[in-house]
Regions:
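Acidic, Ala/Val/Gly-enriched low-complexity intrinsically disordered segments
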Residues: 10-17
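N-terminal catalytic or cofactor-binding beta/alpha core of small enzyme domains
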Residues: 21-194, 199-312
Length: 312
């Protein structure tokens, strides 16, 4: 895992210097890409679906030739090692899980399609709606404009037609599958919880609370996305393991938490955020010596939640 090249599964080609400052055009061969990975979805054993949208490490090689930052810098936009952190929950305890393989810096599936900055494109349609919300204004909409270090990803305007392909080939594929899984679980058990799993930068946690440090954030749209009993159960399970838990700060939930919450259909959502500092070196993108323990603890909380939901 310390070998970055093999881990991200890309061939790094030379930068295309002719794109510097000009319109940037490239075409991705999506047939080369494995978009999703899923586990335990043929026979869903619990009314719980894990969504891991930001842990992907695969960059299309055409994209890498066209952008400014190197791979290490681009990877700082992802939720490092989050999929691997939860591995015991889906490989040993058989929790149904959907994970995106594609890197977040290429497309962010935890955003609405309209969270887009029209100024990024040289051919943005005049009649197309672009909801330039706070995240897209900061460069972190469905298509990231900047890295986590606020460095520009592109040296010039990009093609909106190319981005439409990203949405069709990756974004829609992820959400169509997640929708089917949540519907299947709800039909089988009478209800379903989508646990949207993320990691958060330690910097924002320390801004909000230096003492005690926020280890875990649970986002439930300020008590709107799931029954309080579920949030309280997860909070207590982490607290028993001596993790400090905050609710709805710094994050109350994003697109998946909001969009998949359908109380009338008894489909609920909860966003889980794990402070990266407690399991990894954020700057070097390496696991710390605490990784295995945190992985064990977080996965056990998820498994306990799965059994709790069976009797809910």
């Amino acid at each position: 895992m310390l070998c970055i090249i093999s881990y991200i599964k890309v061939i790094i080609a030379p930068k295309d210097e002719k794109n510097m400052g000009n319109n940037i055009d490239f075409t991705v061969d999506y047939k080369k890409l494995d978009i999703l990975e899923e586990y335990n979805t043929k026979d869903i054993k619990y009314p719980l679906i894990l969504s891991i949208p930001h842990s992907g490490t695969v960059f299309p090689e055409e994209f890498l030739r066209a952008v400014v930052p190197d791979v290490m810098t681009l990877r700082k936009n992802e939720d490092i090692f989050m999929k691997e952190l939860l591995e015991p929950a889906y490989k040993q305890d058989e929790i149904a899980t959907l994970s995106l393989n594609i890197a977040r810096a290429f497309i962010d599936v935890n955003r609405a399609k309209v969270e887009i900055d029209p100024s990024m494109f040289y051919n943005y349609p005049k009649d197309e709606l672009g909801l330039n919300q706070q995240r897209s204004r900061f460069g972190l909409g469905i298509i990231h404009k900047v890295t986590a270090d606020s460095e520009p990803i592109y040296a010039g305007p990009i093609s909106y037609k190319e981005v439409e392909q990203r949405i069709k080939k990756i974004y829609d594929v992820y959400h169509n599958r997640l929708k089917k899984l949540t519907t299947a679980a709800a039909e089988k058990f009478g209800f379903c919880l989508v646990l949207d799993c993320h990691s958060m930068p330690s910097k924002i946690c320390s801004i909000i609370s230096e003492n005690p440090r926020i280890d875990i954030c649970l986002g439930n749209l300020f008590e709107q996305s799931c029954p309080n009993k579920i949030s309280f159960f997860v909070e207590n399970e982490f607290s028993k393991r001596e993790y400090y838990v905050a609710k709805n700060r710094p994050y109350s939930g994003a697109f998946i938490t909001f969009n998949y919450c359908e109380p009338r259909k008894k489909i609920h959502t909860l966003q889980l955020e794990v402070n990266r500092e407690i399991y990894a070196d954020e700057k070097l993108l390496r696991k710390s010596d605490k990784f295995q323990q945190v992985s064990y603890d977080v996965s056990k909380v998820i498994t306990s939640l799965a059994h709790f939901l069976l009797d809910f």
